[in-house]
């Protein structure tokens, strides 16, 4: 019998694995990275191996067991949560069922209440002069308000009350509802399970104990060094300048302006800070905040940086190593020239160099890929590249958004080619590293099977991209010939 024990990355895991082996009358084999032909009890953790590697090991084991270690013994609550999710996925066992009772409770809440999300109780985010529920929402809740006023603001209170009663709020939360229309999960699921676990909330009644936000999202400005084709002027000042020159800048356009918010960030309440842009690593306001936080001794909050990974200065490299819990979400939409074409101004060799530096210095890394008409037939290349160069890094897939669905991947001119790419991606190991990658691709594959080519929409996409190519001096056919040569076959 081969038994795989999952726990935290401490000596206690080895001791508990040894006890499991003794109780079953098998040998204790210790830390595992790959099985040999020996029988016995082995152990590992999500800190030692990537999600995909653990799932592959689980397939070879006769039993997979999550050890009964208290949440307080884990280095980070997310590590515990990720382990629970793996056990669920591989139909493993929990040594202590009571330990997952909180997780099961909130799963039931989400399954029975289509409107509930934890974020209005834990998050503070602003867009220009207004507070919004999260980065996925653009509708204001209220005027910008202080952290002290956040808990009792009438706008927030109304939304919280609606959610508790099971009422959906499509005016604020439509992004997640759209995810759930085509998938079995959404960001509201993930965020709720994460934060109820972190804050040890055992029931809906415990929400009343929250008096101040613990999660902050910041988009300081639209200052960015790239002009990504699926992005917009609100997230890149270069795109704003370009569209103005092309006379297609919306009349109601207004850039993000939250630079001064970094100065008023309440570090003492902060459990997590998510920073995006624009490009945070070229914003002096963000670098200034990091310097102040380090000097004030605030180095243990979770810091998540969404970056294009093109610019890691020596100053930033020295500074970021002083923080203890940093995750880099790196935006990549293709491999090599494909990425550089979609994400204009990027240079693949610089991204690779910076990724290797982050990986070598043991930072948490995940890849964020926007799936669009551009890369829908090239998704497998991203996963195959990760298999070869970064086998422990996972991918988060998201659908390209535009008001007129201009970049909808299901409008691709050759859906058979897209289907093949998805199938090849599903055959990789790294597809198991991201918590939702496999599920996202499987759902996408089902959507492909129920869609026909939209000639008019695809022609609109090509017409728009031709204007961009003419303005930028680039050529779609040289980089992505399948979008030209195999159009609507």
Question: Whereabouts are the PLM-identified features?
Answer:
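Short, basic/aromatic recognition patches
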Residues: 101-118
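Local cysteine-cluster metal-coordination motifs and their immediate loop/turn environment
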Residues: 133, 169-181, 223-233
């Amino acid at each position: 019998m081969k038994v795989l024990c999952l726990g935290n990355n401490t000596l206690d895991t080895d001791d508990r694995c040894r006890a499991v082996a003794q109780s079953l009358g098998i040998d204790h084999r210790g830390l595992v990275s790959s099985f040999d032909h020996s029988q016995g009890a082995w152990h590992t953790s999500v800190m030692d191996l990537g999600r995909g590697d653990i799932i592959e090991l689980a397939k070879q084991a006769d039993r997979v067991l999550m050890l009964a270690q208290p949440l307080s013994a884990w280095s980070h609550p997310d590590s515990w949560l990720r382990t629970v999710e793996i056990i669920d996925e591989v139909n493993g066992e929990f040594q202590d069922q009571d330990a997952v009772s909180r997780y099961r409770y909130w799963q039931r809440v989400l399954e029975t209440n289509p409107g509930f999300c934890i974020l209005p109780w834990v998050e503070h985010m602003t867009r220009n002069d207004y507070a919004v529920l999260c980065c996925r929402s653009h509708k204001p809740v209220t005027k910008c308000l202080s952290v002290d006023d956040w808990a009792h603001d009438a706008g927030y209170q109304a939304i919280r009350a609606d959610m508790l009663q099971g009422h959906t709020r499509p005016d604020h939360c439509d992004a997640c509802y759209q995810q759930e229309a085509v998938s079995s999960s959404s960001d509201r699921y993930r965020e709720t399970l994460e934060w109820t676990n972190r804050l040890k909330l055992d029931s809906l009644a415990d929400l009343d104990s929250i008096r101040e936000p613990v999660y902050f999202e910041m988009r300081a400005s639209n200052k960015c060094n790239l002009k990504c084709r699926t992005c917009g002027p609100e997230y890149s000042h270069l795109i704003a300048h370009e569209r103005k020159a092309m006379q297609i800048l919306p009349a109601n356009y207004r850039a993000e302006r939250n630079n001064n918010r970094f100065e008023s960030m309440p570090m003492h309440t902060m459990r997590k800070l998510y920073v995006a842009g624009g490009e945070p690593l070229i914003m002096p306001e963000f670098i200034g905040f990091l310097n102040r936080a380090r000097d004030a001794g605030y180095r243990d909050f979770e810091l998540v940086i969404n970056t294009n990974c093109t610019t890691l200065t020596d100053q930033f490299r020295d500074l970021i190593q002083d923080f203890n819990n940093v995750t880099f979400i790196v935006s990549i939409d293709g491999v090599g020239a494909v990425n550089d074409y979609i994400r204009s101004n990027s240079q693949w060799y610089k991204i690779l160099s910076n990724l290797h530096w982050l990986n070598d210095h043991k930072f948490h890394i995940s890849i964020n890929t926007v799936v669009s008409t551009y890369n829908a037939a090239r998704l497998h290349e991203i996963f195959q590249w990760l298999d070869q160069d970064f086998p422990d890094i996972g991918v988060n897939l998201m659908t390209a958004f535009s008001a007129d669905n201009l970049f909808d991947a299901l409008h691709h001119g050759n859906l058979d080619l897209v289907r093949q790419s998805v199938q090849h991606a599903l055959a990789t190991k790294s597809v198991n590293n991201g918590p939702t990658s496999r599920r996202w691709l499987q759902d996408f594959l089902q959507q492909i099977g129920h869609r026909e080519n939209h000639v008019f929409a695809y022609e609109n996409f090509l017409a728009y991209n031709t204007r961009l190519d003419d303005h930028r001096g680039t050529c779609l056919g040289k980089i992505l010939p399948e979008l030209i040569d195999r159009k609507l076959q």
